[in-house]
Every structure is written in C-alpha cells, then in structure tokens.
A protein has these predicted regions:
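Phosphate-group recognition and catalysis centered on beta-loop-alpha active-site segments
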Residues: 18-243
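Bacterial Sec-dependent N-terminal signal peptides
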Residues: 1-24
Length: 243
C-alpha cells in the first residue's frame, strides 16, 4: 500500500513537471543580456539571434519603458522605440524581463506588447518574464509566452525542499513556457525540473576567459536549457548542443 501511494506521488510530481516543448527555439542558445539601449539593440541584433531587455511599465504614462530600475524611465526610451532599432525583429527572439509586472498592470502591459508585435509583424518569438504568477497568468490569456523567474537560493534563505515544493506549485498553477534563473541555480533546475524549458542568465564578465567559455558550453549542452544570457560582445560557436 505504501509503495502504491509513493508511486502515485512520484507520478503526480512528474506530470506537474512536464511541459510540452512546442516553442520553436532557434539553433543558437546564446542570447545577448541586458540590451538596454538603442545602440546595443542595433549592434547586438546583428550578431545574436536572441536579445534580452529589461522593461518597466509606467502607469502614469501608460507606457512600457526600457530600463532596469524605475529611474531609468527618465531616459524616455520606450519599448516600441527600442524595437525600431532591432534589425529584422520578426526574425529574432526576445526575452523581456519585466521589473514591475503585477496583476494590476498585466493586461495593459500585454496589450502594448501585442500591439508592438503586430506592428513589427512578429509572431510567437517573444517571452515575458516575471516572478509574479498571477500577473503572468493574465499575460498568458493574451496568447503571449511567459517565463517564470524562480526563487534564487543564492539570494534568499530558503531550504531546498521548500524551494522545490513552491516551484512545483507555481508550475502547476501557471504552466509557464519556461523557468529562469541565474546559472548558479542550473543544477537544481535540471535535476528537479528537467522537462521544463530552462532559460539561464550566466553571470560572467564580458571577456571570453577560458573558464567563462567552458561554463557557457556546459550550460548549452544540456537539452533542457534553451537559452543562456551572456555579456559577450558576440556569440560563441558551440557545437553539438542538446535541443
């Protein structure tokens, strides 16, 4: 009887962890990190297939601005203007890291993004990232892809068992298109959620040091890992990456 119950629990766990890989990812898993101005957008979009940009929604102006912090909105760079600088946006892939997405502004954010995608003739090549599951559920209703940023054990004092339980609960609630975190969480993510699409931010200097390149290769070769954000000036040529 105990074995039967244990088997059921394991099966339920696997079902929760499963996620259909129905997104058509590009061949290159190496995406440019924090492309937060138009100059970078022009340069990086010529070299990288995928770009990550930080975004902040301004309720006062009902507009999405590019920036990592609230004060960055003073630069006045809207997400729409940023996309104008990207070379052939319909042929690229985008990871939008929303810093203040919540259930109150999620509908407006999604409407703006959908409008941008339509004007740029973009189709299913963009992800919206946040840690707020309620907000992401709203964004999903607009047929947009979502990335769930999981809690980072390197930053917060949470035990591993609690992290696994909480993450599994959020996956079940949201059914995200991918999970994300910095590369320090790589081991836990691929061990406990191997069926999920995993997006990682590799915290490395811009230089192509041997240890940095080795780490990039390691991350990209895992089939669960679909995108790795780097600060290199250009992508690396990595062969035999798992799909």
């Amino acid at each position: 009887m105990k074995q039967t119950i244990a088997s059921i629990i394991i099966l339920m766990s696997l079902l929760v962890s499963c996620k259909k890989d129905d997104f058509s990812y590009p061949d290159s898993k190496i995406w440019a990190h924090r492309v937060n101005d138009t100059t970078m957008a022009i340069e990086k979009s010529k070299k990288f297939i995928g770009l990550e940009v930080d975004a902040i929604y301004s309720e006062y102006q009902d507009e999405i601005f590019v920036g990592h912090n609230i004060e960055d909105t003073s630069n006045g760079l809207t997400l729409d203007t940023w996309f104008n600088a990207v070379e052939k946006p319909s042929e690229k892939y985008f990871w939008i890291d929303f810093k203040n997405l919540d259930s109150k502004n999620a509908d407006k954010v999604a409407d703006i993004i959908c409008s941008i995608m339509e004007s740029k003739e973009m189709e299913d090549n963009l992800f919206v990232e946040s840690y707020d599951t309620k907000a992401l559920k709203i964004v999903k209703k607009h047929n947009l892809r979502v990335i769930l940023w999981t809690e980072n054990l390197q930053w917060n004092k949470v035990d591993t068992v609690t992290w696994i339980t909480d993450t599994r609960r959020m996956i079940e609630e949201l059914e995200p298109d991918a999970l994300s975190n910095e590369d320090a969480m790589y081991g836990l993510l691929i061990e406990h959620f191997p069926e999920q699409n995993i997006h990682l931010w590799q915290k490395t200097p811009k230089t192509h040091k041997e240890e940095n390149i080795k780490r990039t290769h390691e991350l990209c070769r895992n089939k669960s890992v679909k995108a790795v954000l780097v600060d290199y000036d250009q992508p690396l040529a990595i062969e035999n990456t798992g799909k």
